[in-house]
C-alpha cells in the first residue's frame, strides 16, 4: 500500500471523527458515507466564483505556422531549402536568384529581359519571405531601382505580388511562381488597379510616350548595374565590367563544355535532334551511317 495514500486516508478519518462532536460535547450524526469503492465529489458551494487556471507554458510554445517552437526554425529552414531546390529545377529563363548569407528569408535576384517593350533591361531585385513561411502572406519582391511599370510602386520599387497571389496557400504556391510572375509582367502589361497610375494611363492612351519612358527606365536601371549592392551581404548579386583576365577563362570553359561526337555512341543521353550534326545548326546535316552486315 502506498504510504502517502494511507496517511492521507487516515488523517481524513480522524478529522471526520473529531467533527462529529461539537464544542459543547453534543453528539452530531455523521453524514452518510458512500458505498465502498465509489468516489463522490463534494457539492459546489453557493455563490462560488470559478477559478480559471493559468495557461500552461507548453501551450504557448506553438508557433504561428502550427509547428512546435522547439523545432519551428528547423521546419522553416527545410521549407526554404525545398523552395530553392524547386527554383533550380524549374530553370526559369532569364532569372537568377541567390539566398542571402545573413538570412534565409531574403533572396537576391536579377531578371534579364530579352525582347518586348523592356528589351535589354537588367533588373535587380530582392525577395523578402515572411518569418512564418509557408503559412503567412506571400513573399514580397522589391526592385533595387523602381521600374516604370503599372504594377511597380514608383517610390519603393515593390511589385504588386498580391494581384497574382491573393491568398498564399502552402503546398500549392511556391516561390518559383512568384519569380516567374515577376518576369511575366514585363511581357504582359496589366493596367487594372495599378501601383503606378501614370504608367497605366500612358499605356492605355499614349503608347508612344509610354515606350519612351520605358526606354528611359531601362537605361536608368542599367546605369546602376555596376553599383555596390544596397544591402551589405557577401551573397548579394553584383556586376563588374568585362575583365579578360578574369572572365575570358570562364567563357572558354562554358563554350568548351560540348559533347564529343564519339560520346553519342556510348548510350549517354543525347541533347538536340538526331538529324543535326554535332557542332552544326544546319538541319539534316548529319550523314547517315550505312548499316554494317
UniProtKB/Swiss-Prot annotation:
Keywords, sorted A to Z: Apoptosis, Cell membrane, Cytoplasm, Membrane, Protein transport, Transport
Where is it mainly found? Answer: cytoplasm
Record keyword Iron present: no
UniProt-recorded Gene Ontology molecular function terms = ubiquitin conjugating enzyme activity
Organism whose genome encodes this protein: Danio rerio (Zebrafish)
Q: What is the similarity comment for this entry?
A: Belongs to the ubiquitin-conjugating enzyme family. FTS subfamily.
Task: Please give the function described in this protein's UniProt entry.
Answer: May function to promote vesicle trafficking and/or fusion. May also regulate apoptosis.
Q: In its UniProt record, which GO terms are filed under biological process?
A: apoptotic process; early endosome to late endosome transport; endosome organization; endosome to lysosome transport; lysosome organization; postreplication repair; protein K63-linked ubiquitination; protein transport
Q: Where is the UBC core domain?
A: 75-223
Topology in the lipid bilayer is annotated as: Peripheral membrane protein
Locations of Polar residues compositional bias?
Answer: 1-11
Q: Where is this region: Disordered?
A: 1-44, 260-293
Family annotation (SMART domains): UBCc
| Source superkingdom | Eukaryota
Name under which the protein is recorded: AKT-interacting protein
Intracellular or extracellular location(s) = Cytoplasm; Cell membrane
What is the gene name? aktip
InterPro entries, A to Z = Ub_conjugating_enzyme, UBQ-conjugat_E2_core, UBQ-conjugating_enzyme/RWD
One Gene Ontology cellular component term attached to this UniProt record is: plasma membrane
A Pfam family this protein belongs to? UQ_con
Amino acid at each position: 500500500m502506498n504510504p502517502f495514500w494511507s496517511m492521507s486516508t487516515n488523517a481524513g478519518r480522524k478529522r471526520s471523527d473529531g467533527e462529529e462532536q461539537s464544542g459543547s460535547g453534543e453528539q452530531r450524526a455523521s453524514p452518510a458515507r458512500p458505498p465502498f469503492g465509489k468516489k463522490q465529489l463534494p457539492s459546489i458551494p453557493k455563490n462560488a466564483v470559478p477559478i480559471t487556471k493559468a495557461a500552461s507554458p507548453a501551450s504557448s510554445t506553438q508557433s504561428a505556422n502550427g509547428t512546435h517552437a522547439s523545432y519551428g526554425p528547423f521546419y522553416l529552414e527545410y521549407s526554404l531549402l525545398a523552395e530553392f531546390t524547386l527554383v533550380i529545377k524549374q530553370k526559369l529563363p532569364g532569372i537568377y536568384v541567390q539566398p542571402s548569407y545573413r538570412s534565409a528569408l531574403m533572396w537576391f535576384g536579377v531578371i534579364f529581359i530579352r525582347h518586348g517593350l523592356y528589351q535589354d533591361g537588367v533588373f535587380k531585385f530582392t525577395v523578402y519571405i515572411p518569418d512564418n513561411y509557408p503559412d503567412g502572406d506571400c513573399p514580397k519582391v522589391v526592385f533595387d531601382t523602381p521600374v516604370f511599370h503599372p504594377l511597380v510602386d514608383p517610390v519603393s520599387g515593390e511589385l504588386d505580388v498580391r494581384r497574382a497571389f491573393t491568398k498564399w496557400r502552402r503546398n500549392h504556391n511556391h516561390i518559383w511562381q512568384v519569380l516567374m510572375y515577376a518576369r511575366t509582367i514585363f511581357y504582359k502589361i496589366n493596367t487594372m488597379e495599378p501601383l503606378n497610375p501614370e504608367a497605366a494611363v500612358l499605356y492605355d492612351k499614349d503608347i508612344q510616350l509610354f515606350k519612351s519612358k520605358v526606354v528611359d527606365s531601362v537605361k536608368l536601371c542599367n546605369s546602376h548595374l555596376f553599383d555596390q549592392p544596397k544591402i551589405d551581404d557577401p551573397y548579394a548579386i553584383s556586376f563588374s565590367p568585362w575583365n579578360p583576365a578574369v572572365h575570358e577563362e570562364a567563357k572558354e570553359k562554358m563554350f568548351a563544355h560540348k559533347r564529343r561526337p564519339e560520346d553519342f555512341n556510348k548510350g549517354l543521353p543525347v541533347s538536340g535532334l538526331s538529324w543535326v550534326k554535332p557542332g552544326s545548326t544546319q538541319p539534316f546535316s548529319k550523314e547517315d551511317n550505312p548499316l554494317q552486315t
